[in-house]
Amino acid sequence: MFIVVEGGEGAGKTQFIQALSKRLIEEGREIVTTREPGGCSLGDSVRGLLLDPEQKISPYAELLLFLAARAQHIQEKIIPALKSGKTVISDRFHDSTIVYQGIAGGLGESFVTNLCYHVVGDKPFLPDITFLLDIPAREGLLRKARQKHLDKFEQKPQIFHQSVREGFLALAEKAPDRYKVLDALLPTEASVDQALLQIRALI
């Protein structure tokens, strides 16, 4: 099973994934957790470039770097893990690119979606289920402000992050069978309980 966790800045994805993984392992599943950009040596190298506020990368170059990292990530890590019977949980995937670069970034939703869906061939490589940790942009940014160092995207203005939130919710509305929206203001364990119900329904 391939699970993706999406959400805006400060939604608590890392904590949610850790808690969800722990519960699934307790149920006897083999879990592989990963993230984007990252998840492989190429992805980790690209991550540093993409998130560095000092790097001046054009929007199209940024998009293609995300896609290059994803293509390698899918082939090197995700597909082999799935073929071996493991459950893969990824912190971000296609929809983050569609929202951050396509919608909030202005490159166009349909244009970016088309590129994402053809990154490893003619057929879209999609998760079995996507959990969206939804949080108001202002609250998410307040959480992030407590950190010492913010990356390039975390430093963007609130209007950008509001567009990100609206973009994710719009994608969730278009794909209700794949998307499950969780309230990121709830305690993590409450969200994990809801997620486990959805995962068990797919088994």
Swiss-Prot record:
MF term (GO), any: ATP binding
EC number: 2.7.4.9
GO cellular component: cytosol
Catalytic activity: dTMP + ATP = dTDP + ADP
Keywords, comma-separated and alphabetical: ATP-binding, Kinase, Nucleotide biosynthesis, Nucleotide-binding, Transferase
Cysteine disulfide links: none
UniProt xrefs under Gene3D superfamilies: P-loop containing nucleotide triphosphate hydrolases (3.40.50.300)
Gene Ontology biological process terms in this record: dTDP biosynthetic process; dTTP biosynthetic process; dUDP biosynthetic process
Binding site for ATP: G7, G8, E9, G10, A11, G12, K13, T14
EC class name: transferase
NCBIfam families: DTMP_kinase
Function text: Phosphorylation of dTMP to form dTDP in both de novo and salvage pathways of dTTP synthesis.
Family of this protein: Belongs to the thymidylate kinase family.
UniProt protein name: Thymidylate kinase
